[in-house]
């Protein structure tokens, strides 16, 4: 039977929620990943060092006994952010600030209204070596939802990189050929995370044969040509600029199967297996370890994990749902097969 042993991966873009939801989902990530970059879009958002440290303590309390998993904490960038906050964050071990354009995604109401007013804050991030994580979509109602990432590149990303050229930027959960091209052409201070859904699915998987609410995420799934461009990027000559970030974003089944359903796909329970499928289909299994376990650590300036995990070429059936607080949670590929299984 085919096996693949790799350095334990890291999830460089993860939503763990809070309270009972946190307790339900944290063990799935802790089982596979050594570390994860934790998104700060709680209600209310994680905007201060005190918020982040308190949230980290709640995450640690939700982990299985004996877990070595390490959450890497971030702050939610707001219009009120200051260079002093950046210095405080650095001193406290916060790894990054996250940009949510106001209204772009779940719990983004506190997001930034004009990033260019925060240039002194971004300059301090560059000085302190704190990363800038970007949800790269414009929220202008005149821009079609399928075009919001591409529009963001010209309107925001390129001008910001020109004004703060040494800022370390992660273009999060990229979904388009345009975003991949920007990262490929930019300096080594610009990288990107890519989700399993944007490597495996296209917008037909959302809309053909009925609306599939469990395939609804933001940024929304794009055309097949964009999916192919992402696969080419993560397996190509400059693959070191791309790394694993699931954007696993749990919502209760009742909130997804809804007249106004929430955006987000829960992939944490089988994340590395789904990525293995992508790389296997692309004939690039030898590049999975760098994507999952090396590139992100290098970009964040942290050592690779010291231990390994082993994947077996053995099919598994994903549960139709798992418990989630008072309700249930539908994972990515629910009820379906994945051709790889982690040996636990």
Curated annotation (Swiss-Prot):
Gene Ontology biological process terms, A to Z: 'de novo' pyrimidine nucleobase biosynthetic process; 'de novo' UMP biosynthetic process
Record: residues binding substrate: 15-17, 41, 135, 218, 251, 263
Protein EC: 3.5.2.3
Oxidoreductase among keywords: no
Keywords tagged on the record: Hydrolase, Metal-binding, Pyrimidine biosynthesis, Zinc
Pathway: Pyrimidine metabolism; UMP biosynthesis via de novo pathway; (S)-dihydroorotate from bicarbonate: step 3/3
Binding site for Zn(2+) 1: 13, 15, 98, 247
List of residues binding Zn(2+) 2: 98, 135, 173
Necessary cofactors: Zn(2+)
Source organism, top-level taxon: Bacteria
Record has Zinc as a keyword: yes
GO molecular function, one term: dihydroorotase activity
Cofactor: record remark: Binds 2 Zn(2+) ions per subunit.
Family to which the UniProt record says this protein belongs: Belongs to the metallo-dependent hydrolases superfamily. DHOase family. Class II DHOase subfamily.
Function: Catalyzes the reversible cyclization of carbamoyl aspartate to dihydroorotate.
HAMAP family linked to this entry: PyrC_classII
Protein name: Dihydroorotase
Species of origin: Neisseria gonorrhoeae (strain ATCC 700825 / FA 1090)
Lineage: Bacteria, Pseudomonadati, Pseudomonadota, Betaproteobacteria, Neisseriales
